[in-house]
């Protein structure tokens, strides 16, 4: 089974610099954080979910820049829920991991860094197709 250790080393802590002017968190390009696309999510209606898919080859790094949300990851056999509520903590979603985002706070603003540009064929949007692909 691919990604058997789906839950190991998926949380990323970035340095946070605070002073009287506010806070700053920075991420610099390195092998772990190579990205081709960045997008943000906001104004999520109460009770809504996002995600509900897996990527064949794309990895993502998710952040709650403001507010909070929950992310459920599944490798087809095991599931784990992560609660993100800090702009300096990110969650890596590796390829071939089913991902569901939910429980968004009303003030949520999220940032996603993706390792590839948008490729519709790279998505698996059906749970059974995902399981059959493992």
Question: What are these model-predicted stretches?
Answer:
Residues 100-101, 108:
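Structured catalytic cores of enzymes that bind and process phosphorylated ligands/cofactors
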